[in-house]
Structure formats: structure tokens, C-alpha cells
Amino acid sequence: MLNLYMWKLSRSQVYQASLLFGSRVISALAFTNTGLVLHGPRRWYTTDNGFLLHRDSKVSLADYIHESTFDPSKGYYSRLWTGSTNNLSHSVHVLRKEGHKCSKEFDPFLHGIPIPQKALNIYEKQRSLFSESISNYLVLQYKLRYFPVFDLKIYDFHSGTGIIALDILDYLYKNHLEVYGRTTYNIVLHNSWQASWFKSMLTSVRYAKHGDHIDIYVSDPLTWNHTDTNPCFVLALQVISSFGHDLFRQSNGAMMMERCWLGPEHFLNEFFTLNTHQKVSSLNYHLAFQQARINVQQGFSDSRAKRYFSGVKQVFWSFFSTQKLTYYPTKAIRFFERLSKQFPHHSLLLMDVCHVDKSLPGINAPSVLSMENDFSTKKMSSNIGHVFQNETVKYVFPTPLYLVSDILQLATHNRSFICSLPHFLRRWSNEHGRKFFVPVEPSSKNLKVPYSFNNYYVVSSMPTYYY
């Protein structure tokens, strides 16, 4: 940016200019010892090769305000500019309306009125598409590698309402009966209420035939002690984002490492240190990373942790940020470590949200923005909240799946492949499922793929050997 003009204006003249060109002009002017300096945009022109280059030129104040207001490439003050801001994106009226919707949905539960759980997840929106794709993927991998020597064993962690599990078994029953007869579907749920509801589903006429093929467990994935040395498939659909990972933030007001809690039930550990911005050697961890290292090693064998943690450390450096709240997926490492120890011949299919669009509407969306638990600043944080009808807002973060994929290879020594969710569904769904995806521009009105699908990614991890 260039210093274009130097004015000797009084504060009253600046106020008159703001009335003429808009209040944003005040933020575009900076007081100096000699007057006021306007920081203006750079002009752009197109070369013969089609490249955009800039040249510095003087513009009038009126032209600058006009151009930067309506053209996002001309300046910081554009109305179309989509950069970050500290202001709340909703007005008081919109926030009050959303609060009324929340209270309307939560009041029956607070008064003891039983209401069914309404888990807003992406899988139940296109049930047939997901069940077809996951089933075809499992059947192909099973027939190529393990059939007919081993049975098909599936371990599904945090399967929600279990609808996807039942749909997968239905699909195998109708299309791959020889595989269905050798299938055992193990479902690991995190509370007894879901287990009882799922057992009631199995008593219905439609799903009663699957009762002999399903085993239900109630446990935390990080504490479940079940072991299976046979080849098996593990499904982790939106599991990593539900873990409370360790968070780190640079804070000038913290004289020592502190630990605070966000939320009464769903905890996020937040560590403060003054040394996170300094480059340190491999033998001198900064306090936050050292604490993360201790947390990760809890429950690990020392030899196993030391063997791959040096590689994980290098991945962490590329992801580390000192300017905003970030986190290390330390519980994901513990989860992968337990899979490697308790299921040594497993193949993992992991699906999770990789980024979140902050313009998603209110409580009826799969994920909504939540206010940071800091009532003194009232700043919007980058975390999101999954809203359930009979549960409080749970603070989670989008999962950096490219980082998770690298950590997965270090922890399990399996080969990992990552792709977008639309690509996975288009690759493994049947013919009518492929018609769901239309290769058109995102701005087209004929786009049939929900936008939220583009926020999800799939990680496929398989052993490097074949039986």
C-alpha cells in the first residue's frame, strides 16, 4: 500500500469527510506528526499473457472510497470483502430469534417432558447413498483380501442412532448374501440410553433378522479394552471431532501455564505459555508441547511412544499457530495407538468434518457457531457446536484430516489415503447414487450436492500386507 496524499486537515474536516464518503473513511486515515496519511489501494492491469499485475498510481479520495466499497480487489474496506472480523455477524434481533428457537426446543426437556433425540448429522440425510458407498467399499476390500479365510468383522465407534449400521446390514443382506452370512457388526456406543434405544430397534420386524449379527458395547473408545487379533474393519464416522483435544493459545497475560475448562461437561483443555513463538530444538520442548507430550504418553508404552513421537513432532510444527486458538489432536493419537495395539490387523475408514462454513444458519444446521466462554471480550471463536435436542451445546473443532492422516501412518504404520466425501460417495455408490453428483459450477442452481458435503473428508487406512 502506498502513502498517496498528505493532508493538513482538522478533526472537524475529517468528520465532514466521513459524512460525505461514509464512516469507513475514518478508519482509512491515520494521524501522523505532520497531518493525515491515506493508505490507498494498488491499481491492477492485465498483461498480454493474462496475468494481473499492479502498478502504483495516485487516486482521489472519492475514487478510492468508491472502488474499495464495491470491488473486493481494490482495498480493505470493500462491502464484498470476506476476510476475518471481530464484529458479531448477526444483529441483536437475529440472536434473540435464535435464542427463542433454542428455548422452545430445550424447554420441554427441562420440564421433564420426554422427547426423542434429534441428532443432526450428515449421514442420516442421505442414508441410502452412505450405506451403499460404505458397503461396497467394505465388500470389495473384504473379498480381495480376506474372503473366504476370515469372517467380516466391523467395529463401529460412536455410530449415533445406529441407522447407518442397520442400513449397511440391509444392503449386505439384499446384495451380498454370502458376505452377510459371515458378518459380525460390533457397535461401540458412549451411553446406555443409545444402547437401549438401539436394542429396541432390533425388536422391530424390519431389523429383527440382524439380531444375530450385531453385538453392542457401551464404552469410551479410549478406555475400551476389547482385543481382536483377526483382520477387521473399523468405522469412525465423525469420531475425532467429538474428542476434547488439547488446545493451545498464545496469551501475553499468562505468566505461567494455566489450565481452564470450557463447558461443564465437554472439556477443552487450554494451555497458556509465553514461549510458544520461539523456535526450540528437539531436546528443549516448550511448555505447552511438553505438556501435550505427557498427555499423549499416558496409557502408552514408552518404547512405542518414543518410536513415532519424533515424527509426530515434526508434523506438529507445521500446524502450530501462535496467533489464535489452535489444538493438537492428542486424543486422536491415543485412539490410533489403541487401535494399533488392540486391533493389530485393522483397516480404518475415518470420516469427519475438515472445515466449517461460518455462514451456516442457526440451530437447525448440522453445526452452528458458538460464543467463546469469555464474557469479558464477547469474541466469536473458531470452534463450532453440535446441538442436540436433549443435550447441551458441545464445543468441537473441525478436524485437520491431512494432519490426522500423517499421524495415523506414524501410529499404525498403515497406508493412508484421503479424499473428499463427494469423491468417495461418487466412487463407491451405485448407478443411481452417481446421478446424485452433477459436475457443474458451485454457483449453478442445478447443483445437487449439498454444500455441507464439501466440508467432509474421508481417510482410508489399510495394512501394507495382504493375506
UniProtKB/Swiss-Prot annotation:
CC annotations in GO: mitochondrion
Q: What InterPro entries does this protein's entry cite? A: NDUFAF7 (IPR003788), NDUFAF7_sf (IPR038375), SAM-dependent_MTases_sf (IPR029063)
Q: Does the keyword Chloroplast apply?
A: no
- Alphabetically ordered keywords of this record: Methyltransferase, Mitochondrion, Transferase
- Reactions mediated catalytically: L-arginyl-[protein] + 2 S-adenosyl-L-methionine = N(omega),N(omega)'-dimethyl-L-arginyl-[protein] + 2 S-adenosyl-L-homocysteine + 2 H(+)
Q: Which major enzyme category is it?
A: transferase
Query: Per UniProt, what is one GO molecular function of this protein?
Result: protein-arginine omega-N symmetric methyltransferase activity
Q: Main localisation, per the record?
A: mitochondrion
Which biological processes are named by the entry's GO terms? methylation; mitochondrial respiratory chain complex assembly
Q: What is its EC number?
A: 2.1.1.320
Q: Determine if Transferase is one of this entry's keywords.
A: yes
Q: Where is it located?
A: Mitochondrion
Query: According to its UniProt entry, what is the function of this protein?
Result: Arginine methyltransferase involved in the assembly or stability of mitochondrial NADH:ubiquinone oxidoreductase complex (complex I).
Family (UniProt): Belongs to the NDUFAF7 family.
Give the protein's recorded name: Protein arginine methyltransferase NDUFAF7 homolog, mitochondrial
